[in-house]
From Swiss-Prot:
Catalytic activity: a quinone + NADH + 5 H(+)(in) = a quinol + NAD(+) + 4 H(+)(out)
Membrane-spanning ranges: 6-26, 62-82, 87-107
EC number of this enzyme: 7.1.1.-
Role, per record: NDH-1 shuttles electrons from NADH, via FMN and iron-sulfur (Fe-S) centers, to quinones in the respiratory chain. The immediate electron acceptor for the enzyme in this species is believed to be ubiquinone. Couples the redox reaction to proton translocation (for every two electrons transferred, four hydrogen ions are translocated across the cytoplasmic membrane), and thus conserves the redox energy in a proton gradient.
Origin organism lineage: Bacteria, Pseudomonadati, Pseudomonadota, Gammaproteobacteria, Moraxellales
Protein name: NADH-quinone oxidoreductase subunit A
Location of this chain's protein in the cell: Cell inner membrane
UniProt similarity note: Belongs to the complex I subunit 3 family.
Length: 207
């Protein structure tokens, strides 16, 4: 028999011996347990329970994408490594450019917070704005100088003010009263329901 045949036989025997070792030794040295817990399905460190159709965190896909990117990088660099002498400086420059592009992409992903999963990372995010900033006035934003600023649609009706809470009619005088009410919008974005023009006339009559 040739040396090639002997090496093939040795490889097959070593593979069989390894399988037998992994099956027999744990059975002889390992402990045994009995009961319902032995029959439970245990996979990836988690006891299976509940519905299998659950939401999977999208961060898992980020890890998978990173793995694919750098796995392919290692494959290409292996091809360069085995032919580094033949490739010369030109091959070195090409490999350096390739690695630089991947590093730039990795830094960009890290700057976007793609790998920030810890609770402490969430606390460092920008706090949500719950109050109006200084100098903010919704009344100034929605203020009209006159009824002529409102556009008339093809049906001849004047559209409502942008907040959708001011009733605008075809009566010009009614619209003027509504425009005075618009000037009293508070900073919370809620439109006041008081007719200030009517209230002012009532106050003048009482006086």
């Amino acid at each position: 028999m040739s040396a090639f045949n002997w090496s093939a036989i040795a490889f097959i025997l070593a593979a069989i011996a390894l399988v037998v070792f992994m099956l027999v030794v744990p059975r002889l040295l390992g402990g045994r347990s009995h009961g319902s817990q032995k029959e439970e399905i245990f996979e990836a460190g988690v006891v299976g329970s509940g519905n299998a159709r659950i939401r999977l965190s999208a961060k898992f896909y980020l890890v998978a994408i990173f793995f694919v990117i750098f796995d392919l990088e290692a494959l290409y660099l292996y091809a360069y490594a085995v032919s580094v002498r033949e490739a010369g400086w030109l091959g070195f420059a090409a490999a350096a450019i390739f690695i630089t592009i991947l590093i730039i992409g990795l830094v960009y992903e890290l700057s976007l917070g793609a790998m920030n999963w810890a609770p402490a990372d969430k606390l460092r995010k920008k706090a949500r704005l719950y109050a109006a900033p200084a100098g903010f006035s919704l009344a100034d934003i929605t203020k009209f100088d006159g009824v002529d600023e409102l556009m008339v649609d093809p049906t001849g009706k004047i559209p409502a003010q942008s907040s959708g809470q001011i009733n605008v009619s075809n009566n010009i005088e009614t619209n003027r009263r509504h425009l005075q009410n618009i000037d009293h919008i508070n900073t919370t974005g809620n439109v006041t329901s008081v007719d200030f023009a009517t209230s002012a006339q009532t106050d003048n009559i009482k006086r």
